[in-house]
Design a protein with these regions (language model features):
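Charge-rich, low-hydrophobicity low-complexity segments
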Residues: 247-331
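Short acidic (Asp/Glu) and glycine-rich catalytic loops that position anionic groups and cofactors
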Residues: 28-32, 57-58, 96-100, 185-196, ...
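Conserved catalytic alpha/beta cores of large enzymes that bind or transform nucleotide phosphates
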Residues: 7-8, 18-55
Length: 331
């Protein structure tokens, strides 16, 4: 999902598909590449749950994140994602996204992250799932004020992309899709890339300023930590005397409701979804019988009776082989 162009997939214009890009993507130089937006292995929450389970078997230490575009009803989807075992639900707003997206998508598709974050947060609380997942917000977050608002609406993590790009030298020429970026960022042209003058320290400094502004807002509100700010929509106020009369007719009370006061439910590491991987056949049989052979990097043989309830059989053990032996076969 992408907030800038939901349902359209990623676009890589043919002009930017240089030979080394084409080789990586198994394509032909100069051919436009469009990533298909639908995931044909995910047509239901059950399909998503199976994929998350498979990924968790591949890497037990992984924190699985699912990205959702802010839209009406995203709270229901977020609840399903939490039940499927994801640890992070990312709500992506319409303002952000790649500069190579079609202009019609950038200006006319998607909804603000504020609506999606508030709905997801409140729906997860109503279903008793809020402590299981982290809510992350992204989509043109630019300042500490944006972070404070996102936090008060229910987010615990925050994604930045456009603002750090500007800190690295992006001058917002809106030519990301043309391979003519004058700052040398959104281009594969070797000559233009020489113009890139960004440094990691620039982003570090920018983030320090964002954090400082957030601290100032928290001080004004009397909030000591970010955790205490999560979900405090009651601290937000609707602006009055807006420029347009149409905006004054909006009712934002649903977004700002908080019946929990200072004790707003939010992510608790102790309540993370338990996949019970220790009960799988991989851990109970393969690791038990072949663990010593794995540590000594010797071959082993084992006959196991597998049933349909042994999902992703061999995946977890295979991940341990790669972790200990690397992903290349010995010469």
């Amino acid at each position: 999902a992408q907030g800038a162009k939901p349902g359209e997939g990623g676009h890589l214009p043919g002009k930017k598909v240089y030979p080394w890009i084409a080789k990586t993507r198994c394509s032909i130089p100069g051919v436009t590449l469009i990533s298909p937006p639908p995931h044909h292995d995910i047509y239901s929450i059950e399909d998503l749950a199976q994929l998350i389970y498979d990924m968790k078997n591949v890497n037990r230490r992984a924190r699985i994140s699912v990205k959702l575009v802010s839209e009406a009803g995203v709270g229901t989807i977020a609840a399903g994602v939490a039940k499927a075992g994801a640890q992070v639900v990312l709500i992506s707003g319409h303002d952000g996204g790649t500069g190579a997206a079609p202009r019609s998508s950038i200006t006319g598709a998607g909804l603000p992250w504020e609506l999606g974050v508030a709905e997801a947060h409140q729906t997860l609380i109503q279903n008793g799932l809020r402590s299981q997942v982290v809510i992350e917000a992204d989509g043109k977050l630019m300042t500490g004020r944006d972070v404070a608002i996102a936090c008060m609406l229910g987010a615990e993590e925050f994604g930045f992309a456009t603002a750090p790009l500007v800190a690295m030298g992006c001058c917002m020429m809106r030519v990301c899709s043309l391979d003519t970026c004058p700052a040398g960022i959104a281009t594969q042209d070797p000559e233009l890339r020489k113009r890139f003058s960004g440094k990691p320290e620039y982003i570090v400094n920018f983030m320090y300023f964002v954090a400082q502004e957030l601290r100032e807002y928290m001080a004004k509100l009397g909030i000591p930590t970010v955790d205490r700010l999560v979900g405090r929509g009651d601290l937000l106020q609707v602006r009055e005397k807006l420029v347009t009369h149409r905006a004054e007719t909006l009712d934002l009370s649903v977004l700002l409701q908080n019946p929990y006061g200072e004790n707003v439910p939010h992510f608790d590491p102790a309540a993370v979804y338990d996949f019970h991987l220790e009960k799988t056949a991989d851990m109970g049989i393969l690791m038990e019988k072949l663990g010593k052979s794995l540590k000594s990097k010797k071959s082993g043989r084992l006959e196991v009776q597998v049933s349909s309830t042994d999902r992703a059989f061999g995946t977890l053990f295979g991940s341990e082989i790669i972790r200990q032996c690397g992903n290349e076969l010995p010469e």
